[in-house]
Amino acid sequence: MGSLSPSDLSPAQIGEHLRVAGRVAAADGAQCDVVDALGGVRVRLRERTGLSAGDLVVIYGEYTGDDLRDAQVVSRTPCAEPRGDGDFARFAWRGVARNLAARARALAAVRSYFASERFLEVETPLRVPAPGVDLHLDAIPASGDYLITSPELHMKRLLVAGLPRIFQLARASRRDELGVLHEPEFTMLEWYRAFAGLEQVLGDTERLLRSVAESVSGAARLFSPSGQVYALDGPFERITVREAFMKYAGIADAVDLSQSDEARYFEVLVTHVEPGLAREARPIFLWKYPANQAALARLSETDDSVAERFELYVGGVELCNGFDELTCPSEQRARFEQDSARRAAENRPVYPIDERFLAALESGMPRAGGNALGFDRLLMLAIGARELGEVLSFPARER
C-alpha cells in the first residue's frame, strides 16, 4: 500500500483508512500535525508515541475530512525541528511551495496556449560563443563561451531553417542583475511567428496573459506588489514613446532626445515615463521606439525614425520586449558593428559578432514577429508577489 502526502488528501477519501507520509510540524501527546510543503493534516493517535517536531513519519488511520483518527505510527525517522531560516520553513511556512504550484499551472497554460496556436516548442544552446552585443546587457563568461542573455539569435536561425512558429522557455543569465525585479538567472519565454508582424504578436501577448492569469488565480487579472488589480479584458491600451514622453514628462519629441542626448532620454524614461505608466490602472503597450533603441527590429514603413518595437507595462513592471524583426543582413551587421564600437568606447565587455546568425540572414529570413517575456515577472504579477525571488525555487540569495 502506497503512502499519500498530506496535500494529496481530498473529500473523496473521507472514511477510508490511509497511509499518510510527511513531517511532524507539532506534537502534543497523542496528537500531532503532519505536513508537507503544500498542506497538512491533524493526526489523533491511538496512544502517546513520543513524536517530536521535525520527525519524518508514515501514519495509518481513518480520514474524516478533518483529521486522521485512531491512527498508528507505521515508521518514524527522528529529525531536528526545522529552523525558521531553513529551506523547509521557506517553502512550507512562507508560501514558496504554493508559489511553485502556481508556477507549474502557469507553465502548463503557456504550453497549452502555444499548442492551440500550433507552435513548436524548441530548445537552443544555453552556452554560446557569441551572446549578442546589446548595449545594456552583459553576459556571464562560461569556460571560453558565454551563458545566453536571450535565445533570440538561435531561434531566428530556426526561422530561417523553415520552422514557422516556435516558442521556448529558456534559462537566461545576465551579469550584475539582482533586485526586486531582477535575478542573474531567470526564465525567458520567447516566441516567433514567421510571415507575421507586430499585430499578431501583440494579440498573442494579450491572450497568453489572460490564459496564464486564469490558470493561477481563476480570473483574467494581475496584481501589483502593492495590491492594485489589473483587469486583462479587452484590447490593451497602446501609447507611442513620443506620446508617453509628452504625456508624462512634457517632452515634445523623445526620438530627437534619444539621438541628441541618450543619457537624458533614459533618465526621463526611468524617472517620469515608467512611473507614469505605473500609475495607470491597466496594462499598456509602449511602442514605436526610437530607431536607435531597437537594434534587432525593423524600421517603421511610415516613419523611419522609429522602430517596430513594443514593451508591455503592468503596474510599472516591464513584462516583455517585442519586435517586428529585422531581416536585412547588411543592416543587421552594421547595427552590430555600431553597438560593438560603442561597447568598446564605454569600456564595456566586447563580444564576438555572431557570424553564423548573419550567415543565416543571408540565406533569407522570412518577415517575423517575436517577443521575449519575463516569465518569472508574469508569475510574480499573477500571484501578487512582492519580489521575483518569491516565485523561484532558489533565487540568488538562497543558492
Predicted stretch roles:
Residues M1-R399:
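Class II aminoacyl-tRNA synthetase catalytic cores and aaRS-like
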